């Protein structure tokens, strides 16, 4: 949003509800429209006058495919030229995760339209480092079920730069599927070392079993749909689905992707407390 507004682009944001986040968008100069992606009339009204759209649906049960169909039809009727679709690196026909398979089908639905269409398949985000972070007085712990798998974590800001670049010049990206990676491929021991260097605090990676991870997610209030997705994604990660490197972020956006250290330094206060889905000691004791 910031990038598009700085470039002088008119931006309309379709939000589920008005809150502090939508007010922030308004402060940036965006036109904010409240609605539901399952409401065809609301989506259709929001598409009027739009030339390019970014489509992103949360990991939630039962809604992605219908929302994609409604979005595609509304965009086609309104004469939208291009769409950038947020998918995921685990999206494929044979995916065991319900969400990942639905993302693959959603890609195919959009490909059947006349819209200029680009699919983004990012690996895990740098923000995951906060998500599962366990903070103690004298150390930090990353407890995750990813064994010795590897990935090149990408920052949300870097993906935003890619999205903004494609939205402004979409034609050369038509029918492309872009796996997006960050600055450096690492295993979680390597990520822990980078976080330790940035914080000046001992940090270690503690691998856990997938059922323990799933139980912790459930205890933290995650939906069964999200638990199913992340449990199978953990298997995918171990199998190398999230691994790899390319330079697409720099080629498309013109900027090198953020490193782990740069991310940690820029979000240092978030490492002072446990992350939203931190696996607590008490759960490990009962596993």
What name fits each language-model region?
Residues 211-287:
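A hydrophobic C-terminal alpha-helical subdomain
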């Amino acid at each position: 949003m910031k990038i598009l507004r700085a470039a002088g682009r008119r931006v309309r944001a379709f939000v589920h509800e008005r809150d502090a986040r939508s007010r922030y968008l308004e402060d940036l100069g965006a036109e904010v429209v409240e609605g539901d992606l399952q409401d065809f009339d609301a989506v259709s009204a929001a598409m009027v006058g739009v030339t390019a759209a970014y489509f992103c649906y949360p990991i939630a049960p039962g809604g992605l495919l219908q929302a994609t169909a409604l979005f595609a039809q509304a965009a086609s009727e309104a004469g939208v030229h291009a769409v950038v679709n947020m998918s995921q690196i685990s999206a494929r026909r044979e995916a065991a995760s319900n969400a990942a398979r639905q993302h693959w089908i959603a890609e195919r639905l959009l490909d059947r339209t006349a819209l200029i269409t680009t699919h983004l398949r990012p690996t895990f985000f740098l923000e995951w480092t906060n998500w599962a972070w366990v903070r103690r007085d004298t150390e930090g712990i990353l407890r995750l079920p990813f064994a010795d798998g590897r990935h090149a974590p990408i920052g949300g800001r870097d993906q935003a730069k890619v999205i903004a670049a494609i939205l402004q010049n979409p034609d050369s990206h038509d029918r492309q599927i872009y796996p997006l990676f960050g600055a450096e491929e690492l295993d979680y021991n390597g990520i822990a070392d980078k976080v330790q260097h940035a914080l000046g605090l001992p940090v270690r990676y503690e691998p856990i079993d997938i059922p323990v991870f799933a139980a912790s997610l459930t205890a933290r209030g995650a939906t069964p749909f999200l638990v199913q997705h992340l449990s199978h994604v953990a298997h995918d990660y171990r199998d190398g689905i999230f691994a790899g490197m390319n330079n697409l972020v720099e080629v498309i956006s013109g900027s090198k992707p953020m490193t782990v250290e740069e991310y940690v330094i820029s979000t240092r206060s978030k490492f002072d407390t446990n992350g939203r889905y931190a696996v607590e000691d008490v759960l490990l004791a009962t596993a």
